[in-house]
C-alpha cells in the first residue's frame, strides 16, 4: 500500500551560464533565475524587486511584512504573497513572526543552507534506492 506523504519541500535549481562580468543587480537576478522564481513573463520584474528589497532589509538586520513589501515595491499585497510563496518554496526566504527574510544572514549563507537541504533529501532518496537494490539483489558499482 502506497502512502500519500505530504510534500515536505520542492527544489528547482536551474543551471545557467555564469555571468561574464560582476554586476550587483545582474548577479541578484541571476541567483533568482537559478532558483526558478524570476520568470520571463514577469515584465515588471516584481520577483526581483521583492528579492532585492529583502536583501536590503537583511543588510539592515530586519524582516518585512507583506504589507511593508507591497508598499516598498509598489504592487498589491496579493502579488507580493504570490512571489513570496515561490521564494519560500525555493528555500531562499522564511517567515518569522509575520516578517519575511532571507533564510540565512547573507545570500551565500542562504545558498549553503539550501545546498545542505538538497544533500539531506538526496541522502534519503539514496537510502531507499539502496534498500531497493538489496531487495532486488542488484549490484551497485562505481562508474569506471
Task: Please identify what each model-predicted range represents.
Residues 16-52:
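Short alpha-helical segments that sit at the start of domains
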Residues 55-61:
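Short helix-capping/hinge SLiMs at alpha-helix to coil transitions
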Residues 88-99:
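A short, conserved structural fragment
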Amino acid at each position: 500500500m502506497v502512502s500519500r506523504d505530504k510534500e515536505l519541500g520542492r527544489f528547482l535549481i536551474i543551471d545557467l551560464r555564469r555571468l561574464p562580468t560582476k554586476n550587483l543587480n545582474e548577479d541578484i537576478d541571476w541567483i533568482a533565475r537559478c532558483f526558478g522564481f524570476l520568470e520571463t513573463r514577469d515584465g515588471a520584474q516584481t520577483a526581483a524587486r521583492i528579492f532585492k528589497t529583502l536583501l536590503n532589509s537583511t543588510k539592515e538586520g530586519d524582516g518585512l511584512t507583506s504589507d511593508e513589501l507591497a508598499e516598498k515595491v509598489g504592487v498589491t499585497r496579493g502579488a507580493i504573497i504570490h512571489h513570496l510563496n515561490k521564494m519560500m518554496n525555493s528555500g531562499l526566504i522564511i517567515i518569522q513572526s509575520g516578517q519575511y527574510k532571507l533564510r540565512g544572514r547573507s545570500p551565500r549563507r542562504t545558498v549553503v543552507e539550501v545546498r545542505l537541504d538538497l544533500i539531506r533529501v538526496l541522502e534519503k532518496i539514496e537510502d531507499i534506492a539502496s534498500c531497493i537494490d538489496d531487495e532486488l539483489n542488484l549490484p551497485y558499482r562505481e562508474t569506471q
